[in-house]
Amino acid sequence: MVKPKRLLSLLLRLIAFGATLAAVIIMATSHEKGSFFALSYEAKYSDTPAFKYFVIANAIVTVYGFLALFIPSESPLWRLVLALDLVFTMLLISSISAALAVAQVGKKGNSSAGWLPVCGQVTKYCNQVTGALVAGFIAIITYIILLLYSIYTFLNSLLGKTPCRLSSPGI
């Protein structure tokens, strides 16, 4: 039987794994052909370095998340997992920040630089990018919750304390 602490950690890791995998698949398959006046073009994630970085970072975290599912809770490797959770959470945050900046320019354009918005011409592509970013945000939020929970349980086990109660009986 799985311990309740391990069950919560496992559930959070499964959610994070699914979200990063979804972000990779959605972004990597995003493409659409469009035209603007007489110009024909194809919008795809691989044309943008920030989107490639997003896919690569999420793929790395997906593999890590899958492997972390199989580490026993009694293993001394959990200290390393805690440190890697922090590193990979920061990696996800940096990749989504870069991708979100490019997506914003694609949606709104930048009149100062003379960049026109493209989402009016390639709406399917922009919707796929938005879906990938939403999945990425779900992964980040899940990893932050997982990180906080892991730190909490690690410190409690390190200090030999049980979680404190917020209220006393009879109050």
From Swiss-Prot:
Glycans are attached at residue 110. It is a multi-pass membrane protein. InterPro entries: CASP/CASPL, CASP_dom, CASPL. It comes from Populus trichocarpa. The chain crosses the membrane at residues 7-27, 53-73, 80-100, 131-151. Residues 28-52, 101-130 are extracellular. Its main location: membrane. Coiled coil: none annotated. Residues 1-6, 74-79, 152-171 are cytoplasmic. The keyword Transmembrane helix applies. This is CASP-like protein 1C3. Homodimer and heterodimers.
